[in-house]
């Protein structure tokens, strides 16, 4: 097994919602195939093939958008 995180597992989020509270409570609605990003503590996946997974973590920030990861 290799512990190197793949590029695709870097934490990122394209659809992040935050409450207006202080501190904000943010969660990501992104669906990823087969796994959640590497920083996700609470990940749920459907039983389909491939599994559609989303991270249920609540943070006080949003991760950077995933689309921007391909280009500098």
Swiss-Prot record:
GO terms for cellular component: extracellular region. The record marks 20-21, 47-48 as: Reactive bond for trypsin. Changing residue 2 to D: In 1st isoinhibitor. SUPFAM superfamilies: Bowman-Birk inhibitor, BBI. Disulfide bonds join 12-66, 13-28, 16-62, 18-26, 36-43, 40-55, 45-53. Belongs to the Bowman-Birk serine protease inhibitor family. This is Bowman-Birk type trypsin inhibitor. It comes from Vigna radiata var. radiata.
């Amino acid at each position: 097994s290799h512990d190197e995180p793949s590029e695709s597992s870097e934490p990122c989020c394209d659809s992040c919602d935050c409450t207006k509270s202080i501190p904000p409570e943010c969660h990501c609605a992104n669906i990823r195939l087969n796994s959640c990003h590497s920083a996700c503590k609470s990940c749920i996946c459907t039983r389909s093939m491939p599994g559609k997974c989303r991270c249920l973590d609540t943070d006080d920030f949003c991760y950077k958008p995933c689309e921007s990861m391909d280009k500098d």
